[in-house]
Amino acid sequence: MSRAFVKDSDDAAPALPDLPLSEHPNYVTPRGLMQLRERLASAQARRDALVNSADTMAQQNELAPLERDLRWLAARLSSAIEVDLLSQPEDRVTFGACVTVDSVEGEQRYCIVGEDEADAEQHRVSYLSPLAQALLGAQVGDEVSWKRPAGDLLDRKSVV
């Protein structure tokens, strides 16, 4: 008897290797923690929908990357260290602070956040970025130099 066109459990898509996890502490703002939880819930809902209707090979193949993403999100959530922004000092730049940078290019406002909530378009920079590293610990009126691809800049900082 031919086995062609028979759906075997062995036909399931193989598990993908885990996504790399950062070696740095997973500091998050309350907003960042909420975003991680929402991403995990959304991915779980998508997985559940696929498991319940995974009739096609394409749907089954979509499960492997989704399972990998779920493992990564669960690991990031379990390692999250929520920083209480209200307990941060207000006289210097710290994690979670929003800072106005005054330079020859004009004023820009940046918020220093965790790795997973960084978003260049929204001026939310990871605390590990060169800009955040230059700003951390600075006080209003301090001048700091930060390394960037376009060359070093000397900027005055004012905490907002």
What positions do the PLM features span?
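Generic preference for well-ordered secondary structure
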Residues: 12, 17-20, 24-27, 57, ...
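Short, intrinsically disordered, mixed-charge
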Residues: 42-45, 79, 133-140
